[in-house]
C-alpha cells in the first residue's frame, strides 16, 4: 500500500491525526467492498477514487459513504470520475 502521506494535498500539513482520518476513510470503503480505493485529502474535501468499473457501486452506496466521511470530518465528499490512478495528487503539480 502506498504511503498515506501521498493522499494529502500539496502544501497541507501532515499530522498523525490527518493520516488517521485518511486511513479510517479508506477502511470504511474497503469494509463496503471496495478493495482498491484511495481517499485524497483536500482539507475539508475528501476525494474518493475507485476503479472506473466500480464507480456505479459507490453511487449506489452514496448515503452511507457520505455519512461515514462526514463523521470523519469531511464537509465535502466527492467521487473522482476518472477513477483510481496512482499519483493523482501529482497531476496538479505537473501542470504548466
Regions found by a protein language model. Name each.
Residues 1-96:
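Nucleotide-activated chemistry modules centered on ATP-dependent adenylation/adenylyltransferase
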Amino acid at each position: 500500500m502506498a504511503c498515506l502521506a501521498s493522499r494529502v494535498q500539496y502544501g497541507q500539513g501532515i499530522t498523525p491525526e490527518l493520516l488517521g482520518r485518511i486511513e479510517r476513510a479508506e477502511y470504511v470503503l474497503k469494509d463496503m467492498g471496495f478493495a482498491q480505493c484511495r481517499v485524497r485529502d483536500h482539507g475539508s474535501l475528501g476525494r474518493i477514487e475507485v476503479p472506473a468499473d466500480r464507480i456505479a457501486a459507490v453511487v449506489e452506496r452514496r448515503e452511507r459513504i457520505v455519512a461515514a466521511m462526514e463523521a470523519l470530518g469531511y464537509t465535502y465528499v466527492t467521487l473522482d470520475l476518472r477513477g483510481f490512478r496512482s499519483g493523482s495528487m501529482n497531476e496538479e503539480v505537473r501542470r504548466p
